[in-house]
């Protein structure tokens, strides 16, 4: 099973070894787009030749933070692919898990993404959703399947009609979360987890 909505990975400065998230998607058989800056395009294109397409934002080293690349993914999903939603992920996610009976189980395909999409698509007021970090969910702690109205980082499923966009040079995940929480509810899954390097469950933002 693969995600219904397009998946994007933003990456910079990892062309030599390749983004971890892309390697995970190769193992899981998940198609994805890789968004990079112009000066690194050739390296990424050669290194990640299994990507659906390597996309390029307008300029290199613009100093505006990763929000510009995230917005470029958003525009591509909405205006080119005409998609209702899109996934956007950081490039340093080492693996994905599902939580069952408080046990983290490593996934073997994209079913966790499709399950998250199916859940979110039941509602008209979910603007942003995403997975939680696996290190917040230890085996012996009580967990609920999802959490509303909280911050979402690193792995996000975004409604393309959401009126708020990525902004700010730093902490753009937090800024988007706070912007969306003004009008929407957020949903974070606790059934699906992602394992991030140096930085899961499911979260959403919903409109009241």
For every predicted segment, state its role.
Residues 4-30, 40-47:
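Short, well-formed alpha-helical segments that are part of the catalytic scaffolds
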Residues 18-20, 44-46, 97-100, 139-146, ...:
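A short acidic (Asp/Glu
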Residues 1-6, 13-17, 168-170, 174-208:
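C-terminal catalytic/acceptor-binding lobe
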Residues 34, 85-89, 127-132, 187-191:
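A structural signal for short, well-ordered beta-strand segments and their strand-loop junctions
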Residues 95-179:
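Conserved catalytic core of nucleotide-sugar-dependent glycosyltransferases
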Residues 36-89, 94-108:
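Active-site-proximal specificity loops/subdomain of glycosyltransferases
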Residues 39, 135, 194-195:
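Conserved beta-strand edge residues that scaffold enzyme active sites
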Residues 23-28, 72-79, 115-122:
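A generic secondary-structure signal
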